[in-house]
Amino acid sequence: MSPIDALFLSAESREHPLHVGALQLFEPPAGAGRGFVRETYQAMLQCREIAPLFRKRPTSLHGALINLGWSTDADVDLGYHARRSALPAPGRVRELLELTSRLHSNLLDRHRPLWETHVIEGLRDGRFAIYSKMHHALVDGVSGLTLMRQPMTTDPIEGKLRTAWSPATQHTAIKRRRGRLQQLGGMLGSVAGLAPSTLRLARSALIEQQLTLPFGAPHTMLNVAVGGARRCAAQSWPLDRVKAVKDAAGVSLNDVVLAMCAGALREYLDDNDALPDTPLVAMVPVSLRTDRDSVGGNMVGAVLCNLATHLDDPADRLNAIHASMRGNKNVLSQLPRAQALAVSLLLLSPAALNTLPGLAKATPPPFNVCISNVPGAREPLYFNGARMVGNYPMSLVLDGQALNITLTSTADSLDFGVVGCRRSVPHVQRVLSHLETSLKELERAVGL
């Protein structure tokens, strides 16, 4: 087991579940009978060939961190890991998200491989859902979403049902992209070998370009210690609406997404009499790949974006966000790989402090919220003939970072998954209505 995987396992507690998940929503095929979901679930249980990743469980000697390792289960109880649930009446999306929130709050059983899949029926409109989760020691959020898409096909009538745990879904090796904390851990090891001059250059890049720096974020109700219970919210927006704002304003799609989130967070905090005078700061993962990079390589960094929540005008906020992201990405893309790595380390290393008990209260937040836009499928996807109409990432929250917003694309929509600490972030579902309001304000601001 790698030191980073061991860190995820050792840092987990009842208050800090460290798994990532996704809620996928499906529309049964035309003519599907009342038993379609049950039959689909039974067919999933017949997929008894299980990939090695789904057989791994942690083991330790006398509880010592340095002796943590992986064991391989020869006999995986699929009836335990793959479960079927039914929603109570009236079967609204509200009931679905309440169940998802409870499932996302529960720790995975360390005596078994660290994953679960829940097939959920009972939605009154006939749709069904699949909620899946895996421990962050096995996958990060991006590779987890990729893995959960593996059973999908672009052909609605393809006959053979596949599952995420089936070896057949592993024909393309999943290159694990580092998540926020895994990326930090990897950078800690890599940057140790950098020459001092490289670090000085990276530090100069931050100061001379006047980039957004850690610890410049205001302390808010989102930056407190968290409990173990989670509240999940999810909603989709037409991709065309966001693209129309992008084209009219001459900015990137991610700039518009960040502006949507900025407006929503501004209203949410204002509703709670907690809007600070200084702007919120978001941690935003970005791709640093250039045309010169090989296909197999990864170049992923992170920047801190000024969300301009102190500005009343949505157009001004969008312009400020565009300028902040452009400046940050330009500096990182022009640096050699080692220096870009060092800059990302300087930006993210303070976040590691908040993983230690009590320090979330004692230190200013390095940033206020993580907002991640994960590339998704460009074509409609199907599972056993059922079209996937929503794919909502469910990430993790940490002490000092009580809210997470992650989104991905599904064909012609953007699917937002919002996860908050149930105790620290009340009525997290209101963030969704504020996102819609924020998008409408942006549309008006650019003349749409």
Curated annotation (Swiss-Prot):
Pathway: Glycerolipid metabolism; triacylglycerol biosynthesis. One of its GO terms (biological process) is biological process involved in interaction with host. One of its GO terms (molecular function) is O-acyltransferase activity. Its EC number is 2.3.1.20. Transmembrane segments: none annotated. Induction: A possible member of the dormancy regulon. Induced in response to reduced oxygen tension (hypoxia) and low levels of nitric oxide (NO). It is hoped that this regulon will give insight into the latent, or dormant phase of infection. Keywords: Acyltransferase, Glycerol metabolism, Lipid biosynthesis, Lipid metabolism, Transferase. InterPro entries: Acyl_transf_WS/DGAT, O-acyltransferase_WSD1-like, O-acyltransferase_WSD1_C, O-acyltransferase_WSD1_N. Pfam families: WS_DGAT_C (PF06974), WS_DGAT_cat (PF03007). It catalyses: an acyl-CoA + a 1,2-diacyl-sn-glycerol = a triacyl-sn-glycerol + CoA; di-(9Z)-octadecenoylglycerol + (9Z)-octadecenoyl-CoA = 1,2,3-tri-(9Z-octadecenoyl)-glycerol + CoA; hexadecan-1-ol + hexadecanoyl-CoA = hexadecanyl hexadecanoate + CoA. The keyword Lipid metabolism applies. Coiled coil: none annotated. One of its GO terms (cellular component) is plasma membrane. The active site is at H136. Was identified as a high-confidence drug target. Belongs to the long-chain O-acyltransferase family. PANTHER family: O-ACYLTRANSFERASE (WSD1-LIKE) FAMILY PROTEIN (PTHR31650), WAX ESTER SYNTHASE_DIACYLGLYCEROL ACYLTRANSFERASE 4-RELATED (PTHR31650:SF1). Upon expression in E.coli has a weak triacylglycerol synthase function, making triacylglycerol (TG) from diolein and long-chain fatty acyl-CoA. Also functions weakly as a wax synthase, as it incorporates palmityl alcohol into wax esters in the presence of palmitoyl-CoA. This is Putative diacyglycerol O-acyltransferase Rv3740c.
